[in-house]
Amino acid sequence: MRLVLVGPPGAGKGTQAEFVAAHLAVPKISTGDIFRSNVSQGTPLGVQAKRYMDAGELVPDEVTINMVRDRLAEPDASEGFLLDGFPRTTPQAAALDKLLVDLGTALDLVLELVVDDDEVIRRLSGRRTCRGCGKVWHVEFDAPSQEGRCDRCGAELFQRDDDKPETVATRLREYADKTAPLVDYYGAQGKLVGIDATGPVEDVTVRAIDALRSYSG
């Protein structure tokens, strides 16, 4: 099965991608992993990407799409894959459709993790990161025994800039502007399935797998 996973920041995409890919026995492919692999191996595409990254610029779609093409052409993706973090825009989605046609295949399904903005802000703004060991706690869902201190190493906890409510709100606006139109794009193709991403991680995984069973069964 060939899948794309979409959803706003804080929806739990990374976690669900791992579980769903393992359930389907297909590789989880993220653009972050692809970038790191190409850059560390010094591939021609990696060299191009690093040039932009070092300059603090966005890597052009052409470079990203060619990296994705190379990854999807590898043998382990021949029977299926789960894409996490790509596509992010409708032009990227159209390019993905084209490259899959070139590879003689097509997407089967797009899973959308659905969670409202207030819940995303609650999830992300409650995170606290340990200055010592890097462990991430949560003031509501996974609080340390002593407020502001890490149970693991005793170091101070802090709120990353990315987790501050105003930053989260900005990220949500960016998602709505750029990535949310993917929902319409894939909905028009009849490939979109919405998954309620509220509640415990395990419950969300069950909903996602049930949706896949309904599709394939």
Swiss-Prot record:
CDD domains from the UniProt entry: ADK (cd01428)
Q: Does the keyword Cell cycle apply?
A: no
Record-listed ATP binding positions: G10, A11, G12, K13, G14, T15, R127, G199
Might you report a single GO cellular component term? cytoplasm
Which residues are listed for Zn(2+) binding in this entry? C130, C133, C150, C153
Q: In which pathway does it act?
A: Purine metabolism; AMP biosynthesis via salvage pathway; AMP from ADP: step 1/1
Q: Name one GO biological process term.
A: AMP salvage
What is the annotated localization of this protein? Cytoplasm
One MF term in the entry's GO annotations: adenylate kinase activity
Q: Locate the region NMP.
A: 30-59
Which SUPFAM superfamilies does the entry link to? P-loop containing nucleoside triphosphate hydrolases
The catalytic activity, as recorded, is: AMP + ATP = 2 ADP
What are the record keywords, sorted? Answer: ATP-binding, Cytoplasm, Kinase, Metal-binding, Nucleotide biosynthesis, Nucleotide-binding, Transferase, Zinc
Recorded hits in PROSITE patterns, A to Z, give: ADENYLATE_KINASE
The record's annotation in InterPro entries points to: Adenyl_kin_sub, Adenylat/UMP-CMP_kin, Adenylat_kinase_CS, Adenylate_kinase_lid-dom, P-loop_NTPase
Q: Where is this region: LID?
A: 126-163
Q: Where is this protein chiefly located?
A: cytoplasm
One Pfam family in the UniProt entry? ADK_lid
According to its UniProt record, the EC number is: 2.7.4.3
Positions of AMP binding: T31, R36, E57, L58, V59, G85, F86, P87, R88, Q92, R160, R171
How does the record describe its quaternary structure?
Monomer.
Q: What the record says about its domains?
A: Consists of three domains, a large central CORE domain and two small peripheral domains, NMPbind and LID, which undergo movements during catalysis. The LID domain closes over the site of phosphoryl transfer upon ATP binding. Assembling and dissambling the active center during each catalytic cycle provides an effective means to prevent ATP hydrolysis. Some bacteria have evolved a zinc-coordinating structure that stabilizes the LID domain.
The text of the family note is:
Belongs to the adenylate kinase family.
The task this protein performs is described as:
Catalyzes the reversible transfer of the terminal phosphate group between ATP and AMP. Plays an important role in cellular energy homeostasis and in adenine nucleotide metabolism.
Name of the protein: Adenylate kinase
